[in-house]
Regions:
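Small-residue hinge/turn detector
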Residues: 162-175, 381-391
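Glycosyltransferase-associated regions of secretory-pathway enzymes
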Residues: 1-163, 180-380, 398-559
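Short aromatic-hydrophobic micro-motifs that form the base-stacking/packing surface
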Residues: 176-178, 394-396
Length: 559
């Protein structure tokens, strides 16, 4: 008997794993066997799963465990002089940045070393970091990566912590040293077949990499030259150069063997049209192609809306407008209100007459991955991840008013749809607001975001709410469509559409046409005075008053 089966089929002709998941009852072993047979015959439609319509297909981007890795011929095992060990030395009392992570991952995937030893002068960690989690990612994704403190006996700090210790290691045991901002543009595995290879920046001020056998006379000679600042091609045969990449759009480095990275973040490489961009994407995402968002799962996002409410509360007029906008503008099949059922009041009683409004009892989540949830808003985050992963649909906060239908948007087939926040966060190029979030059930982004909550910080409101979602987007950008018109964020009645070039200036409102530019408006804090009650709305003017009156004019059967 085969229960709840997730079946992976490998296509020899394309070297691609395909995932087939049964939608109904997987107890029928004959159906499973038929899937394998049909796939082997090439008869199963890879887009629809037709041949057996009770099956659907999804391309799982994480099945290929070796994405971005160089393949190794057997000849790589022979005629190597240099030990297959890579060394880095980190002299700063802070954690690493993305450029350092990219350097180390490039070494791991392209050089395929036995191990990478990362020597540090200080005990570093990224436990309290907001953006730079790259060290933790190395420690959990690179099996051969290890960290070691510089030995207390090391007494040559007058020369600098970094290269001099590395030279001492190579002189003793051999191997390969890479600068912590080094990035190869071509395969460097050939250097292990030479007893000594070195590359520097063009002025020879900085060593890019050194590969050496232990006790090498050429290495000893080079060390003397480097101390005396006499490194030049005439004295160092076969000397290679690595250029510094001051700007990621530089094209003069296309034919270089290697480069040194300056400040860089993942979003800069997602669509970068250059040799470096292609290689960086291969290392980061396992595919050199520019990031393109395509559906992984079949069908479209379900036209159902999820909302969350806990606690004894009389539904106020602002909340009424929000839910009414969902029922009349979005016009969903169902609206599920998840919570403890303590929401009440005349406005709720009116809206409950619509049988599309359904209450789903749920206990208040108090922990996630064993960590206490303090903020009520974070409890909503936990629930929306769980609900959307299970059922899909549209999540909407209680301070979101919908302005136009979403049918065309969800018909495009994207697995997940969201948009950036207007609020700048230290160290972040952008942040993400999930007050409006659309997703198919089982969407990859939602699962990865839920997984990221293992890093939940109980007392850090913004980290959990808008920073972690961005980190998920940064790591899996191909799984999510960023729709800048999905919601306009407002704060203290000033609105900041993310499609406006100055949207990050939250002290000044940016203009937009609410009647046609956006799907929804998210007024956050405070509630507009016009929404205090019906009388206030009737006597108010301005954009928020116009929006409120627009919602009241929408046809509702139970008015």
């Amino acid at each position: 008997m085969v229960c709840g089966l997730l079946l992976y089929v490998f296509d020899i002709s394309t070297n691609v794993y395909t995932t087939y998941k049964h939608l109904e009852d997987d107890t029928d072993e004959n159906k499973v066997i038929s899937v394998i047979e049909e796939s082997n015959k090439g008869k199963l439609n890879r887009e629809t799963g037709s041949g057996d319509k009770s099956l659907y297909l999804s391309r799982d981007y994480n099945i290929d465990l070796f994405k971005g890795y160089d393949e190794l011929p057997l000849s790589e095992l022979e005629f190597n002089y240099v030990p297959n060990e890579i060394y880095y030395v980190w002299c700063y009392n802070r954690t690493i940045e993305f450029k350092n992570y990219l350097s180390i991952m490039a070494a791991w995937k392209l050089m395929r070393p036995d191990s990478i030893t990362f020597y540090t002068k200080y005990s570093i960690t990224d436990n309290n970091e907001h953006y730079n989690f790259w060290l933790s990612e190395l420690l959990t994704s690179v099996s051969g990566f290890k960290m070691e403190k510089l030995p207390p006996s090391w007494d040559r700090d007058e020369h600098g912590c970094g290269i001099w210790f590395a030279l001492a290691v190579l002189e003793d045991v051999g191997g390969i040293y890479f600068s912590t901002d080094f990035f190869p543009l071509k395969s460097l595995r050939f250097i292990r077949k030479n007893k000594f290879t070195v590359a520097t920046t063009k002025n020879a001020n900085e060593i890019s990499f050194i590969s050496s056998i232990p006790k090498s006379e050429r290495l000893k000679s080079f060390i003397k030259l480097y101390k005396n600042k006499e490194v030049r091609p005439a004295l160092v045969p076969g000397l290679h150069y690595c250029e510094k990449l001051f700007n990621v759009t530089m094209t003069t480095i296309e034919n270089n063997l290697c480069i040194h990275l300056e400040k860089i973040i993942p979003v800069q490489i997602m669509h970068l049209n250059s040799t470096f961009g292609s290689l960086a994407r291969k290392i980061m995402y396992g595919d050199s192609q520019q990031i393109k968002v395509q559906p992984i799962l079949p069908g479209s996002i379900p036209k159902i809306v999820h909302m969350v409410w806990f606690g004894f509360k009389t539904m106020n007029f602002a909340m009424y407008l929000c839910l009414r906008s969902i029922l009349t503008v979005v016009n969903p099949d169902k609206v599920y209100i998840h919570g403890d059922g303590q929401l009440h009041g005349k406005y709720l009683q009116k809206l409950k007459k619509d049988n599309r409004v359904i209450f789903v009892y749920r206990e208040i989540p108090r922990h996630v991955f064993g960590k206490q949830i303090i903020y009520m808003q974070h409890r909503s985050d936990i629930i929306r991840a769980d609900i959307l992963l299970k059922y899909g649909g549209i999540y909407s906060d209680w301070d979101v008013i919908w302005l136009k239908p979403i049918d065309e948007l969800i018909s495009k087939g994207y697995d997940t749809i969201l948009n950036f926040d207007h609020m700048p966060r230290p160290g972040y190029p952008d942040s993400i607001n999930l007050g409006v979030l659309m997703s198919k059930p089982g969407a990859h982004f939602i699962k990865r975001w839920q997984d990221s909550l293992v890093n939940y910080r109980s007392r850090d409101f913004f980290f959990n709410a808008i920073e972690l979602p961005y980190k998920t987007f940064e790591r899996y950008p191909h799984t999510v469509h960023v729709e800048s018109h999905l919601q306009v964020m407002c704060y203290f009645l000033k609105c900041h559409p993310t499609f406006h070039p100055d949207f990050r200036n939250y002290n000044v409102p940016q203009p937009f046409d609410w009647t046609k530019d956006v799907y929804s408006i998210h007024f956050t804090h405070p509630d507009p005075p016009a929404y205090a009650n019906e009388s206030a709305l009737q006597n108010s003017t301005g954009m928020f008053a116009d929006i409120g009156n627009f919602i009241l004019k929408q046809h509702f059967e139970y008015d």
